[in-house]
UniProtKB/Swiss-Prot annotation:
Native species: Dictyostelium discoideum
Active site per the UniProt annotation: E335
Catalytic activity of the protein: a 3-oxo acid + succinyl-CoA = a 3-oxoacyl-CoA + succinate
Protein name, UniProt field: Probable succinyl-CoA:3-ketoacid coenzyme A transferase, mitochondrial
Function field: Key enzyme for ketone body catabolism. Transfers the CoA moiety from succinate to acetoacetate. Formation of the enzyme-CoA intermediate proceeds via an unstable anhydride species formed between the carboxylate groups of the enzyme and substrate.
Gene3D superfamilies: Glutaconate Coenzyme A-transferase
Associated pathway: Ketone metabolism; succinyl-CoA degradation; acetoacetyl-CoA from succinyl-CoA: step 1/1
Quaternary structure and interacting proteins, as annotated: Homodimer.
Sequence similarity: Belongs to the 3-oxoacid CoA-transferase family.
Leading EC class: transferase
Gene giving rise to this polypeptide: oxct1
Listed Pfam families: CoA_trans
């Protein structure tokens, strides 16, 4: 008779069934060091997380301690200088990064521009889908994201610079094959798989089933499916059966190793909380720059219509949600995996596992839902988001947008903007009318690498509002105190003037 502490095995027509057990699973490792010690030089690692939210911090530190080198690391972000993947960059164990947005890591930017690091930037939604496809055995897929851009379709974007300071490009991105479907062009993207995946979950059972907490889910599920060996760092391990089957986020078939982390720093990149209402802010006069931004944002808020699903970009676009008109109800979608984003939390109620796409702490609302980055971009790519509001560096007269890179000096990455601009949702770009040097930002042709081609529907600045109609600009609103000739002097692109030209509209406060 079998011991009560062992699994009871029942054989029925060549199918093995296991009853409950208190025995130790062979997937559970004593510590992170043991779980990663066999990772060899030159491995390809898939690392979960979004910013610093949901990163496998103990596994990353353990990889650093092994001294393994020449790694190719696939991750949405590159951490910060002294935390997350930043520690592997600092120790120079990474040869190539495949990422979407790396704007928070100065070490990353410096190594890339000096030719010390290979960097393959990819749109965030493409990254999520390439991983999902890799885990599903799909070698490649077609997408409209990146059509008409040097980063995706055209190729030629620098992957590696020479390390002699010359600025010469040694490795460039390859152009993508294209195909027309129903008259629309699509690019072929290859899937991504890895040797090892390092992911972070909230809870695991002894069979490897995983549960994530809030937006710490993000890229972890697609990463988990796409590797030969997936190592999950968790906060709690429970016996099989304690996680109900319909509560499992990632089934144990994808997980080979489990480690319970001894502690978690869970650093927050942007702790953002509600400001106390004292009345002082209303009485304090705004400086000119703040007044410009508020004027832009208050006009942008008039784009909201009742019942809309909206995605707001980082910076000024996010502020538009502070001015939603009375009687209008919208749901905010955040590409890191949240639908129904609430306001910033009160001080002391913030949660490191609950952030928005700008890495700011947020809350949920009744009816919110949380999902993986792959599901998030399926919503976006599928055209289920009604309105996208983005910032811009340049917009052309035919609606091209550039907002993600200044070659040779600023490397942020495209993030989710390329996916959002190609999704078929209405795209509104908000920005100041000119640069800080007074040069136009609305141009005949963008001079910076494009985010999207012919994708902008409306441009809102502190001076004017333009619609893009059949590939041409039409001026529809002008701020009081400015004439059409004033706008022409500050706008390089040609435009027509609406017969119903109005003053610049503002939402009521």
């Amino acid at each position: 008779m079998l011991s009560r502490n062992l699994k009871t095995l029942v054989k029925n027509k060549n199918i093995l069934y296991f009853t409950t057990s208190t025995s130790k699973s062979n997937k559970i490792y004593e510590n992170a060091k043991e779980a990663v010690k066999d990772i060899p030089n030159g491995s390809k690692l898939l690392v979960g997380g979004f910013g610093l939210c949901g990163i496998p911090e103990n596994l990353i530190s353990a990889v650093r301690d092994t001294g393994v080198k020449d790694l190719t690391v696939v991750s949405n972000n590159a951490g910060v200088d002294d935390f997350g993947l930043g520690v592997l960059l600092k120790s120079r164990q990474i040869k190539r990064m495949i990422s979407s947005y790396v704007g928070e890591n100065a070490t990353f930017e410096s190594q890339y521009l000096k030719g010390e690091l290979e960097v393959e930037l990819t749109p965030q939604g493409n990254l999520a889908e390439r991983l999902r496809a890799g885990g599903a055995g799909i070698p490649a897929f077609y997408t409209s994201t990146g059509v008409g851009t040097v980063l995706v379709e055209e190729g030629g974007f620098p992957i590696k610079y020479a390390n002699d300071g010359s600025g010469k490009v040694e490795i460039k991105s390859e152009p993508r094959p294209t195909q027309l479907y129903n008259g629309r062009k699509y690019c072929l993207e290859e899937s991504i798989t890895g040797d090892y995946a390092l992911i972070k979950a909230w809870k695991a059972d002894t069979r490897g089933n995983l549960v994530f907490r809030n937006t710490a889910r993000n890229f972890n599920p697609p990463m988990a499916t796409a590797a030969k060996i997936t190592i999950a760092e968790v906060e709690e391990i429970v016996d099989a059966g304690e996680i109900k089957p319909d509560e499992v986020h990632v089934p144990g078939i994808y997980i080979q190793r489990i480690v319970k982390g001894p502690s978690f720093e869970k650093r927050i990149e942007r702790l953002t909380v509600q400001k106390e209402k004292t009345g002082e802010a209303a009485a304090k006069p705004k400086d000119e720059a703040a007044a410009k931004r508020e004027r832009i944002v208050r006009r942008a808020a008039l784009e909201f219509e009742d019942g809309m699903y909206c995605n707001l970009g980082i910076g000024m676009p996010t502020l538009a949600s502070n001015f939603i008109p009375k009687g209008i109800r919208i749901e905010l979608q955040s590409e890191n995996g949240l639908l129904g984003m609430g306001p910033f939390p009160k001080m002391g109620e913030h949660d490191a596992d609950l952030i928005n796409a700008g890495k700011e702490t947020v809350t949920t609302i009744p009816g919110s839902s949380i999902f993986s980055s792959a599901d998030s971009f399926a919503m976006i790519r599928g055209g289920h988001v009604d309105l996208t509001i983005l910032g811009g560096m340049q917009v052309s007269g035919n609606g091209d947008l550039a907002n993600w890179v200044i070659p040779g000096s600023m490397v942020k990455g495209p993030g989710g903007a390329m996916d959002l601009t190609s999704s078929g949702s209405r795209v509104v770009v908000i920005m100041e009318h000119t640069t800080k040097h007074g040069k136009p930002k609305i141009l005949k042709n963008c001079t910076l690498p494009l985010t999207g081609k012919s994708c902008v529907n409306r441009i809102i600045t502190e001076l004017a509002v333009f619609d893009v109609v059949n590939g041409k600009l039409e001026l529809i609103e002008v701020v009081d105190g400015q004439t059409v000739d004033d706008i022409k002097s500050k706008t390089e692109a040609e435009f027509t003037v609406s017969k119903n030209l109005k003053p610049l509209q503002q939402v009521e406060i």
